[in-house]
Regions:
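Conserved kinase catalytic-core helix
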Residues: 46-60, 80-124, 128
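ATP-binding glycine-rich loop module of kinase domains
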Residues: 9-51
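Short beta-strand micro-motifs within the conserved protein kinase catalytic domain, predominantly
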Residues: 61-71
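C-lobe/activation-segment region of protein kinase-like
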Residues: 111, 125-182
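Short, glycine/acidic-enriched loop or turn micro-motifs at the edges of active sites
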Residues: 78, 118, 135-137
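Hydrophobic residues embedded in beta-strands of well-ordered beta-sheets
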Residues: 70-72, 127-128
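Short pocket-lining segment of the protein kinase catalytic domain that shapes the ATP-binding cleft
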Residues: 72-80
Length: 182
């Protein structure tokens, strides 16, 4: 068995109901993950690779755009997905994820990952990392706040909806970030 043995871990129809289906697959190789798209989008692809190399140096191992498709090889991040049932969803765990996402927003601003599902958060003891950066781009503050709240509710239930817009904890953070990065 060599490094090229793989198995398909996800297949997604990107735009269902269109003339032809745009499909993205994710393969788990022994040495890396590969996302493959059966279509091309150079306007997304090249800036996306550049952004990832800036925000997460070394995460992209290889990438290629052809006439018929595109693919990106990603470094394997050690640890378990936060969605793993071994993690107890107690207040300490919820607080740890909440604090990590806010820290990530601060770290990557003006970009925002915006796919903070537990399945995209990898925990390895005290280290926490994000995977699946496809939605990451420069975002408006309102969008970051809305997606943050939607993610926390999806991850932990409606009791974890955040505060009203006027006193949302991300507002002062985002305002401060936008002022310091001018």
């Amino acid at each position: 068995v060599d490094q090229y043995d793989d198995f398909l871990i996800q297949k997604v129809i990107v735009d269902p109901g269109q003339t032809w289906n745009k499909i993205r697959t994710v393969h788990n190789y022994k040495t890396h993950y590969r996302k493959h798209w059966n279509y091309t989008d150079p306007e997304w692809f090249y800036p996306h690779i550049e952004m990832l190399n800036k925000l997460r140096p070394g995460f992209v191992i290889n990438a290629r755009l052809t006439k018929k498709g595109m693919w990106i090889d990603y470094k394997v991040i050690p640890g378990q997905k936060a969605s793993d049932p071994d993690f107890v969803r107690d207040e300490q765990f919820i607080s740890r994820i909440y604090d990590f996402v806010i820290s990530n927003i601060k770290e990557t601003y003006p970009y925002a990952h915006c796919d903070w599902a537990l399945g995209n958060i990898i925990i390895d003891d005290t280290n926490i990392e994000l995977i699946d950066w496809d939605c990451c781009r420069i975002q408006k503050h309102e969008h970051i706040i809305r997606i943050f709240d939607e993610s926390m509710v999806k991850n932990f239930g409606p009791g974890h909806a955040n505060f009203k817009k006027s006193n949302h904890p991300l507002i002062p953070i985002l305002q401060s970030l936008s002022e310091t990065r001018r």
